[in-house]
Amino acid sequence: MTGSIWAIVPAAGRGTRFGGPLPKQYLQAGGQPLMAYTLAALAAHPALAGIMVAIAPGDADWPGWTAVQSKPVLTCLGGATRAASVLSGLLALPESVRADDFVLVHDAARPNLALADLDRLLEIGRGDPVGAILAAPVRDTLKRAGDDGGIDGTEPRERLWRALTPQLFRRHQLIRGLTEASAAGVEVTDEAMAMERIGLRPLLVEGAEDNFKVTTPADLARFEFELANRDCGPGTRDPESAHPQSSVSASAFSGPGSRAPGPEEI
């Protein structure tokens, strides 16, 4: 596959659930901000053409990266919500990106994406007229709570999935979905929800359980544990679980903050 897919990374949020002075995407793990691993995971795929990062106005923590693994990294101003940031990124993509081209959307603080998962998402999603998302089947027993905190019942889990990212959609359809949701005053919590609102049915592509989002200190500790115990990238472990972030060289990132996570630091 040639580099034809752009990825949008919404990174304008403050991560209030995590606490602390830094937005969670800039928290350090293995000596580098989480977002360095996120961008490296995306850029490792040959189909990726570039990355658009939606950052907050006046973001003093943005390292100023302009490329990763020779793939361009562009920035635009994000909005007050995730949906607004993604829409801003969609509208700011280069003129070469057509309306019916597929685009990826990936969480800035979801740094543990495996190359095999991204490859499978692109292969399946680009064969569908709508697109697809990475997701994981719900395996725990689900309880429905009453107002008093008691259990009102047990929910069937056979058809329930947890939505992950990346999510892959055609540019013009996602713009329409996000725009209509905003006009209706509906806060969508992921891009698939915006697509559902306009009557479209994306596919579910099963992804790895360890493609988690860092939202709490425990999540950060889990990712640091993953780094400390990870083999050094593709070729040294089962390729189905290889994480390209492990083998990114220190010269992979360009721009003012051009240090990237190298294997010697992991």
Curated annotation (Swiss-Prot):
Pfam families found in the cross-reference section: IspD
Record-linked SUPFAM superfamilies: Nucleotide-diphospho-sugar transferases
Catalytic reaction annotation: 2-C-methyl-D-erythritol 4-phosphate + CTP + H(+) = 4-CDP-2-C-methyl-D-erythritol + diphosphate
Record-marked site positions (Transition state stabilizer): 17, 24
GO molecular function: 2-C-methyl-D-erythritol 4-phosphate cytidylyltransferase activity
Keywords for this protein: Isoprene biosynthesis, Nucleotidyltransferase, Transferase
GO process terms (BP): isopentenyl diphosphate biosynthetic process, methylerythritol 4-phosphate pathway
Enzyme class, UniProt record, top EC level: transferase
Compositionally biased region (Polar residues): 243-252
Gene3D superfamilies: Spore Coat Polysaccharide Biosynthesis Protein SpsA, Chain A
PROSITE patterns named among the record's database cross-references: ISPD
CDD domains, per database record: CDP-ME_synthetase
Residue span of region Disordered: 229-266
Site positions (Positions MEP for the nucleophilic attack): 157, 213
Superkingdom of origin organism: Bacteria
Described function: Catalyzes the formation of 4-diphosphocytidyl-2-C-methyl-D-erythritol from CTP and 2-C-methyl-D-erythritol 4-phosphate (MEP).
Family per similarity comment: Belongs to the IspD/TarI cytidylyltransferase family. IspD subfamily.
This protein's name: 2-C-methyl-D-erythritol 4-phosphate cytidylyltransferase
UniProt source species: Xanthomonas axonopodis pv. citri (strain 306)
Gene name tied to this protein: ispD
